[in-house]
Swiss-Prot record:
Entry membrane topology: Single-pass type II membrane protein
Keywords for this protein: Autophagy, Endosome, Glycoprotein, Hydrolase, Lipid degradation, Lipid metabolism, Membrane, Signal-anchor, Transmembrane, Transmembrane helix
Taxonomic source organism: Coccidioides immitis (strain RS) (Valley fever fungus)
Protein name: Putative lipase ATG15
Subcellular location: Endosome, Multivesicular body membrane; Prevacuolar compartment membrane
Amino acid sequence: MMTPSQWKDDICTSQLAMVACAIFLLLPIFSPVVFATGLESHRNLQVPFVQPEDLGFLPQRSPQGHEFALRHIFHHGTYQYPLLHKRLDVNPETKIWVASEDGAKLEFSPHFRVSSQPSQIQRLTDRRVQVMEARLSAARTPEVFSTLSPPVWTIDELPGPNISDKTTVLNLAKMTANAYIMEPGAERWEDVSGPFNQSLSFGWEKDGLRGHIYADQTNSTIIIALKGTSAALFDGDETTTNDKINDNLFFSCCCGQGGQYFWRQVCDCYSSAYTCNSTCLVSALVTENRYYRASLDLYANVTDIYPNSTVWLAGHSLGGAVSSLLGLTYGLPVVTFEGVPEALPASRLGLPVPPGTDPNTPQAREYTGAYHFGHTADPVYMGTCNGATSFCTLAGYAMESACHTGQRCVYDTVGDLGWRVGIGTHRILNVISDVIERYEDVPTCVPDTECRDCALWKFFESNGSHPIPPSSSTTSPTRTRTSTCETPGWWGCLDKTTTTGTTTNVITTSTSTCKTPGWFGCKDPTTTSSVPSATPSPTPIITSISMPTPTSTTCETPGWFGGCNDPPTTATSKPNSSSPSTSTTCTRPGFFWGCWDPTSSSETPTAAFSSTATHTSCASKTWFGRSCTTPAPR
């Protein structure tokens, strides 16, 4: 008797029999009889689906081509007009002038050919706008978010950009370059939300997030290209001020604080050295006038116009980072060019995270459908534009993030072309003409799972009532001390210590008047005076020393370290004798000491008991009192 396997081997031998055998083997999969048996227990039965690629005799699916054209331009206000949302429809016959980020005019290409290929993305099954908004709002409140049921995740296979095709990558880059377009003409902007017509307000075009909507011929695929950071260096030109605020919110460890001197501070969440309030950071990021909030509203309005279309996202620089955050939120294919590393803000926005993934390291997440193109000479893309003398720092940008979500597609322009790292290579026009068009092939995309942002920083959470928590107080179960310091110092309090108590002390009062001060004390003879106090004390001992001959010494020129530099003066008393009196005046003193004048003397007879006195005086003394420059008149 033949076994089933032997029967199958004998039947499926010829070529015609192989086709018939394959159809027979696929019948259990496509036939409803196997699944609809009528029993309740069979309803939850899961049978693995065999992909057509796994069958060797079926052809592989080739990338499909799409031809995209500009259909709409959306503008969402962020700072001056946070409720502003306008739409400009572009007709095929509309003439559009495109200006690049550096002001150069470009010839507008009405059509862009892009190919697609299947892409696997892990995302939520329920991605309705109202459901996602509720989850994002609850994620900012841990108490509410913890009570929600776990969302249902799935890995969907949907058409995405063919990142291995050079033409596709090049045209997507051109779409992001065209996203820097100014107002294309005199067409009328329509209000998307709200009854307020703010089009008459001057300057609204320079405030907000601008996205360009491209659609293929069948409207089956939509591409949203978001505008990135303006090229102006300082404030006041285009949307540079707003872009700088968002850049420092998104890509710095703590709002541009605790780093370089020129970084623009955009919030007050810094607590101490390398310590930051993460609750304050999240609150600053999700405010309604920020770009991420504007991108969510823009996506909601685009999907309202095209509810059944597949949406792709593209962007350059800040626009690329915002596109990536939006793609992580809704599970959309994303292609960015020279995008700022966005894993850091992705970990702070409360984005939905699949089970088994660390929310603090979104760069380790798989099946994101995000691809970030860039080259090694761009310090913004590589995450190195944060030194003290870097262009970003001098312009006020705090670019501390270095990790990308999804996969990185890096052109090694430093190694292959010998480029030097510089901010000038960040512009999208340079990337298009000097990088993408110059290379024959596109680089291989790889994930960046081992990267870490802000490794030296510590982040803590607060209740959200204060941007910076008050000073903490430390209590001990064995000792409690309360003190108020009015003069804090570097290593403690500088206030004087006050002690309350009853003590009995012996009071000793010393009064001294120094007539001859020296460098390290007084040179006067020591005089001691003792005043007895009321407290009993030992009997004082007073010692008096009587000199046989009193001597009085007066020093006019004290020395540096003690002693006297005056010339010696001698007084001698001799009874029953008389001697002449001699007076000497030096008019030519020596260089160091002595006198070069001839010796002169005057004799004056005196009475008995007289003495010989010699007086030498000097008005100006130099070299520590050893020489005389100006003799004093006598």
